[in-house]
């Protein structure tokens, strides 16, 4: 079943937007944070639209979200997200430093029509970072404490749709549930691509999400959803080693450092089967008193970007395409000298129907000045990769279960 057909089976948010009703809305505003400050508020902007819909309808919105994971530097309170949400909503919201305790429950009960209450980082709850089947997650404290206070559940966090966690899959088991506009838009945009059945569709795959990206490449080619694939970043390193077998180069050292040597054989198998459709790097840029392009056989330093010859070859692939799915950068985009490959490819792709996925890709698109030219900008990182790879999303499965169980 195609994504457009699936989303049609799930009630959209309009079914849940009722004056005086309490909605639990799961969004994903997980954002890059440096020195305690949010440096990219793209997801917050996207989800502010959803919260505005709820507020304008006179619903009472209880917002669940997370930031980082326990033990990570970016695991912070959602209080720092509050002013960003208010900025894009152009209205005040409430925040409570609690999730399922007496204070949170009291404030939920006292919400007035049109008000929005942001709860604390849901991953403070240890049960939220444990993945289980939806029926088990429906028995967690989070769901048992909050569900009785709500009339509906709205899932809008596409970027966390691949997680089988309580805030994602638990509530649909016990509450009538709807798909939020961000989530619906994501599935419809990707569904439109898959309806093309690969004709004129190219995937530019970079970054370092190795297992997921490799699986996505395999599934997209196997199912005929893309015609061509061009690989860069760490993914490109693995494919280059699989194709050229340059096992004594700095390339191997970088792959080994990431623990990805076992994936070289899988890349080799994909190249043997789909070699004419997969384009791999032939040169790389290194830092040698500035940017220097080096061919794959002469590489003796850590590669930081695709080289000039590779960039030209990939641009030719893009120019022959109708749709370009861009997931992951080609190099170390934090350094302008090594963002060149990614930015040039993004500029070329902006003349096609461009779909962007992943935080680093979006940041690069902003640098390249092409973000506004994209046909669709996904809020998802790993969820985006897994969706285009054809994996079943736990959130989708839970929402379909809810749609069968409850009549809206």
UniProtKB/Swiss-Prot annotation:
Root EC class: transferase
Molecular function GO labels: ADP binding; ATP binding; phosphoglycerate kinase activity
GO CC annotations, alphabetized: cytosol
Pfam families hit by this protein: PGK
Superkingdom of source: Archaea
This protein's pathway: Carbohydrate degradation; glycolysis; pyruvate from D-glyceraldehyde 3-phosphate: step 2/5
Subcellular location(s) of the protein: Cytoplasm
Record field: catalytic activity: (2R)-3-phosphoglycerate + ATP = (2R)-3-phospho-glyceroyl phosphate + ADP
Family matches, as InterPro entries: Phosphoglycerate_kinase, Phosphoglycerate_kinase_N, Phosphoglycerate_kinase_sf
Gene3D superfamilies the UniProt entry points to: Phosphoglycerate kinase, N-terminal domain (3.40.50.1260)
EC code: 2.7.2.3
Binding site for substrate: 28-30, 43, 66-69, 123, 163
Amino acids binding ATP: 334, 358-361
Keywords: ATP-binding, Cytoplasm, Glycolysis, Kinase, Nucleotide-binding, Transferase
Subunit composition and interactions: Monomer.
Entry similarity comment: Belongs to the phosphoglycerate kinase family.
PANTHER family reported in the protein's UniProt record: PHOSPHOGLYCERATE KINASE, PHOSPHOGLYCERATE KINASE 1, CHLOROPLASTIC-RELATED
Name the record gives this protein: Phosphoglycerate kinase
UniProt source species: Pyrobaculum aerophilum (strain ATCC 51768 / DSM 7523 / JCM 9630 / CIP 104966 / NBRC 100827 / IM2)
